[in-house]
Amino acid sequence: MLHMVILRHSPESCPGRPGNEAIHPCANAMQEFLDNAGVKTIGRWADPPAHVNYLVLEAPDGHVIQEALMESGLFAYTTAEIRPVMSMD
C-alpha cells in the first residue's frame, strides 16, 4: 500500500539551521528502520522555504511508518501526516 508522508518542521527546528545537527541522526535512523522493516521508498521531495518534506512509501500499513517516526526520534522535531494514497493514472 502506498502512503504519502508529509513531514513539517518549524524554522527553529530546521535541519539546515546551524545548531540543529541533532536531527540528522534521527533522519538516518528513520531510513534505517524503514529499510529493516521492508518499506520501499518510492520518492522523496523537499520544499525548503515551507519547511516541508514529502515521502511516498510502500508499506503494509501506516503503523510501520508511525513506528519509524517514533523509534528514530524524528517525531520530536516534526509533525507528520501519514495518508494512504492510490494512483489516479
Regions found by a protein language model. Give the residues of each.
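Short S/T/G/P-rich N-terminal loop/turn motif that feeds into the first structured element of a domain
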Residues: 1-51, 63, 67, 85-89
